[in-house]
């Protein structure tokens, strides 16, 4: 990301140069960022040398970064082969680490939804809306969806508790029916058609991953040439 690139401009400008020359992949997440940063300690850092040689120098940070950038460009041009070897070593290390990479708990896979599974029943308010929405649209054809919803909400709030019970009881019956239907559905297990779709989706995902691996291998071969 942009912020991560900025954070390594001085302390490890080598990585930015290598990524710009497509010698090292840019990590798309924080976990992957740490993989590369841990390996960055093996790289030479002229910026640190500059600070040691000039401890009392008062320089603006922007000017300091500019100076580091110029120094790295000069070094990279002179010792290109050395940096290419280091980049390949970093890339190999990166790929080894990524093979054992486990996504954070927050990254959940999208669950497969069977279109034939029982649908959740609407709440009392939505049953009320489905009855009165056509009437409001007929009386106010120019109203936007948001305005229609606001009118329905106002009508619901002004409806007497006794009148609301009609919709609440209806919603309760639909909820009980849903509980029975979903229990029966789960007892039977996933239908064959749904299983086939899930298997097909998994195969497609595996095929995409294999194609990406082949592309990475091809890129490595091209770099070696």
From Swiss-Prot:
GO terms for cellular component: cytoplasm; PML body. InterPro entries: HMG_box_dom, HMG_box_dom_sf, HMGB, SAND-like_dom_sf, SAND_dom. Residues 185-225 are annotated as: Disordered. Residues 26-102, 118-186 bind DNA. SUPFAM superfamilies: HMG-box (SSF47095), SAND domain-like (SSF63763). Residues 210-225 have a biased composition (Acidic residues). SMART domains: HMG. Keywords: Coiled coil, Cytoplasm, DNA-binding, Nucleus, Phosphoprotein, Repeat, Transcription, Transcription regulation, Ubl conjugation. Its main location: nucleus. GO terms for molecular function: DNA binding, bending. A motif (Nuclear localization signal) lies at residues 66-83. Residues 157-224 form a coiled coil. It comes from the Eukaryota. The keyword Coiled coil applies. Residues 1-25 form the SAND domain. It is found in: Nucleus; Nucleus, PML body; Nucleus, Nuclear body; Cytoplasm. Residues 194-206 have a biased composition (Basic residues). GO terms for biological process: negative regulation of endothelial cell migration; negative regulation of protein export from nucleus; regulation of angiogenesis; regulation of extrinsic apoptotic signaling pathway via death domain receptors; regulation of Fas signaling pathway; regulation of transcription by RNA polymerase II; telomere maintenance. Sumoylated. Sumoylated with SUMO1. Sumoylation depends on a functional nuclear localization signal but is not necessary for nuclear import or nuclear body targeting. Sumoylation may stabilize the interaction with CBX5. Phosphorylated. Together with PML, this tumor suppressor is a major constituent of the PML bodies, a subnuclear organelle involved in a large number of physiological processes including cell growth, differentiation and apoptosis. Functions as a transcriptional coactivator of ETS1 and ETS2. Under certain conditions, it may also act as a corepressor of ETS1 preventing its binding to DNA. Through the regulation of ETS1 it may play a role in angiogenesis, controlling endothelial cell motility and invasion. Through interaction with the MRN complex it may be involved in the regulation of telomeres lengthening. Homodimer. Interacts with members of the HP1 family of nonhistone chromosomal protein, such as CBX5 and CBX3 via the PxVxL motif. Interacts with ETS1; the interaction is direct and modulates ETS1 transcriptional activity. Interacts with the MRN complex which is composed of two heterodimers RAD50/MRE11 associated with a single NBN; recruits the complex to PML-related bodies. Interacts with HIPK2; positively regulates TP53-dependent transcription. Interacts with CASP8AP2; may negatively regulate CASP8AP2 export from the nucleus to the cytoplasm. This is Nuclear autoantigen Sp-100. The gene is SP100.
């Amino acid at each position: 990301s942009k912020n991560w690139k900025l954070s390594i401009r001085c302390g490890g400008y080598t990585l930015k140069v290598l990524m710009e020359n497509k010698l090292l992949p840019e990590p798309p997440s924080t976990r992957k960022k740490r993989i590369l940063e841990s390996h960055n300690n093996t790289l030479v850092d002229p910026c640190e040398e500059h600070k040691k040689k000039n401890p009392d120098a008062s320089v603006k940070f922007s000017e300091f970064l500019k100076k580091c950038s110029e120094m790295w460009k000069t070094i990279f041009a002179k010792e290109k082969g050395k940096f290419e070897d280091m980049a390949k070593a970093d890339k190999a290390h990166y790929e080894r680490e990524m093979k054992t990479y486990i996504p954070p708990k927050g990254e959940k896979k999208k669950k497969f939804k069977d279109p034939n599974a029982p649908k959740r029943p609407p709440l009392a308010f939505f049953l009320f809306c489905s009855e009165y929405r056509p009437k409001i649209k007929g009386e106010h054809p120019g109203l936007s969806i948001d305005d229609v919803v606001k009118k329905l909400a106002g009508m619901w709030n002004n409806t007497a508790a006794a009148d609301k019970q009609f919709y609440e009881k209806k919603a309760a019956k639909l909820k009980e029916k849903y509980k029975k239907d979903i229990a029966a559905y789960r007892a039977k297990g996933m239908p064959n058609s749904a299983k086939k779709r899930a298997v097909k989706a998994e195969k497609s995902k595996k095929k995409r991953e294999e194609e990406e691996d082949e592309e990475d291998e091809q890129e490595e071969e091209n770099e070696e040439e």
